[in-house]
Amino acid sequence: MLRYIIPRKKGTFVIAAFLTVAFFCIVAYHRNDRRRTKFQFPDIEKYAEELVRLPETWNGELHQIPNYTAPREGPGEKGKPVVLTGKDAELGQADMKKWFMNVHASDKISLDRDVPDPRIQACKDIKYDYAALPKTSVIIIFTDEAWTPLLRTVHSVINRSPPELLQEVILLDDNSKRQELQEPLDEHIKRFGGKVRLIRKHVRHGLIRAKLAGAREAVGDIIVFLDSHCEANHGWLEPIVQRISDERTAIVCPMIDSISDNTLAYHGDWSLSTGGFSWALHFTWEGLSEEEQKRRTKPTDYIRSPTMAGGLLAANREYFFEVGGYDEEMDIWGGENLEISFRAWMCGGSIEFIPCSHVGHIFRAGHPYNMTGRNNNKDVHGTNSKRLAEVWMDDYKRLYYMHREDLRTKDVGDLTARHELRKRLNCKPFKWFLDNIAKGKFIMDEDVVAYGALHTVVSGTRMCTDTLQRDEKMSQLLGVFHCQGKGSSPQLMSLSKEGNLRRENTCASEENGNIRMKTCSKKAQFNERWAYENKMIRNLKSGKCMSTANLKPGDNAIVVECDEKDEHQKWNFIDPAKA
């Protein structure tokens, strides 16, 4: 790709020079070895794709923070999308496959671009006493990240952070191999006059241990972790520092705005969310609870959140290590965000979102680098999550094993140090966390009418209700399938005391003879309420009963007129492990 080797402002001259040199090299090569077969002139685009990007050499001038009040023109300015056409579009789509983001579009955007400010006026009106606030180390971990997304992260932090509050930016290179991230990166950061420190690890640590390494190197009173494909927005740092200065045990997060992985469009708004979790131990976004809405007296107040997404957070550096940092035996990435969330709340701290602080993040559909852990472990999220379940979830770890029965007996390393940490910090039980912080979290096997694999047996053939691997984040029809046993999570169902036939987050309703699973209402609607009588599952609104009549595995479940003599309508909730 010529974009990697040709500076934009010198395009015509450099192309001519490149082709001239290539021509004479080919002639010399051909003349010096007549024994070779006839030489084929290489395809210039294909050849260029093999070359590494050579960023422009630093000219010795120190970085100047842009005047964002002045008009700016150029691709992507003000967060506008970069829409590619023709050959550019082809290169961009190739990047989507390689990088899971459009690096070609990113390369057209200034490293110092302006982005829309989503803050409300009340946030902008807050005055901060910089002299009274602690200084911050911003830590950015990267491994073989694309050049412009990485550098735009750094530039945005430098450009939009008060110098009085920014102690340093630590770039921690987790064993990158790409040439442009070697000497060219060393050269690029010189323009920041020592404000940016580059620390290199020559053995892969993985994100979790690399964050710990960065935190140990930091000298600021506050540490902020950012992913390597972010853009800090206007006024992002001040409210974070102020909150941690006010409350030492608060671990806080900015509001995370979305940057398109394809067009690099910046989408920021004032919608407020909190973090939740699934019993499979994945992070989820949730709306603000009624209790939290009432607690907050003004729109600039911090938001208490049960969990955090993980990539972007800030903490008092001393407190971060006092409360246990990260579990150093967790591998690469995954699970550490819920582990620190549960631990912070249970051990006397808090997790909070700061509505006046915004940072954009490129959400990618995959990882362009190796995510395999030690001993060739390709399930690092699973094994990391088991470590947190065993240490922090008490008996509620059973709910994790409902989803990951395969990990129940798996060795995930020594947990002694983490158990001792919990004891030393005098942390509360996980039930306290559920009762006081994650209120309303549905527990499928606790305080319900019935729970288990919902199955029926007809002529010796057993079938269970099943999600059929459909995306439960969207409204989907419930299906039936052969009972899988061993706690197969897609087949687990509960009947709540409110009459909801439900899974963790979705409830069943009768719809045109089928059963639709959709996000549960706060108060069950009449068509979402069911009764379990005489082994029959009856919808209270339609009066019809769930049936497998004339169904085969993989079909959608149906409701029909109730008939107590029809064995297709007889259902049992049975122990998931025996289903």
Curated annotation (Swiss-Prot):
The chain crosses the membrane at residues 13-30. Substrate binds at residues 174, 204, 228, 333, 364, 367, 369. Mn(2+) binds at residues 227, 229, 361. Its EC number is 2.4.1.-. It is found in: Golgi apparatus membrane. Disulfide bonds join 123-356, 347-427, 464-483, 507-520, 545-562. It is a single-pass type II membrane protein. Residues 302-364 are annotated as: Catalytic subdomain B. Residues 31-579 are lumenal. Pfam families: Glycos_transf_2, Ricin_B_lectin. It is an enzyme of class 2 (transferase). Its cofactor is Mn(2+). Residues 133-243 are annotated as: Catalytic subdomain A. One of its GO terms (molecular function) is metal ion binding. Residues 1-12 are cytoplasmic. Keywords: Disulfide bond, Glycoprotein, Glycosyltransferase, Golgi apparatus, Lectin, Manganese, Membrane, Metal-binding, Signal-anchor, Transferase, Transmembrane, Transmembrane helix. The keyword Glycosyltransferase applies. Glycans are attached at residues 67, 370. There are two conserved domains in the glycosyltransferase region: the N-terminal domain (domain A, also called GT1 motif), which is probably involved in manganese coordination and substrate binding and the C-terminal domain (domain B, also called Gal/GalNAc-T motif), which is probably involved in catalytic reaction and UDP-Gal binding. Probable glycopeptide transferase involved in O-linked oligosaccharide biosynthesis. Glycopeptide transferases catalyze the transfer of an N-acetyl-D-galactosamine residue to an already glycosylated peptide. In contrast to other members of the family, it does not act as a peptide transferase that transfers GalNAc onto serine or threonine residue on peptides that have been tested. Some peptide transferase activity is however not excluded, considering that its appropriate peptide substrate may remain unidentified. Belongs to the glycosyltransferase 2 family. GalNAc-T subfamily. This is Probable N-acetylgalactosaminyltransferase 9. It comes from Caenorhabditis elegans.
